[in-house]
Amino acid sequence: MDKKARARAAAAESARRTALRRAAMFTSPGVPRDLLASLPASARAFASGGLAAALSFAAPGGAGWGAPLAAELLDLTRTNMRAVYEAAPGWGGWRDGKKRGELLDSDARYFVARAAGGGGGGGDGGGGGGGGGDGGALLGFAGFRFVSEGERDVLYLYELQLAEAAQRKGLGKHLMALCEQAAREAGMQ
């Protein structure tokens, strides 16, 4: 195979992979695919260690997304990570604007965990925090994207954030398992 033929084959393969990734992410152009919809109902609930959570899917531009949810995700990330960013040499400290941009990226996808039954789930006992969604207080989320790394299409986990009251109860492990299932369903590695 000559150089031009190899380049054409590589371009065709790249286009095929991009189309597969887009099909995994969207039901139609600009409409994010609900990645929980194809999973068993048991995947949308969590109960362990005295913690009960209802899980939902959210993506910028999709159903269930709005400024209140985006603010909640940013608030939880800031609470958990600001000190780490400030202490890490070379990271440039915490910057709300930069993190907000990452969270709002059109390719970002989220599995969101909220206290089941509208209660605080062991947290502050309040409602939805910023009013960002149905149910109770935000307990945590997994933020991810479908990306290409070299010649492999993968689900890349950008954030796994849990409220203090939800830590060490298995919720993070459950969110990771959902990400793995979503990757398999989408044909990713």
State where each predicted segment sits.
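Short amphipathic alpha-helix that is part of the acyltransferase structural core
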Residues: 49, 53-91
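Glycine-rich phosphate/pyrophosphate-binding loop shared by adenosine-nucleotide-utilizing enzymes
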Residues: 53, 134-141, 155
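Active-site rim helix/loop that mediates acceptor-substrate recognition in acyltransferases
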Residues: 83-117, 128-131
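Short hydrophobic/aromatic beta-strand element in the GNAT-like acyltransferase core
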Residues: 108-112, 141, 154
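A conserved beta-strand-loop-helix scaffold within acyl/acetyltransferase catalytic domains
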Residues: 115, 142-152, 160
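A short, internal acetyl-CoA/4′-phosphopantetheine-binding micro-motif in the GNAT/acyltransferase core
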Residues: 157-168
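Conserved acetyl-CoA-binding loop-helix of GNAT-fold acetyltransferases
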Residues: 168-181
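Conserved GNAT acetyl-CoA-binding A-motif
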Residues: 183-189
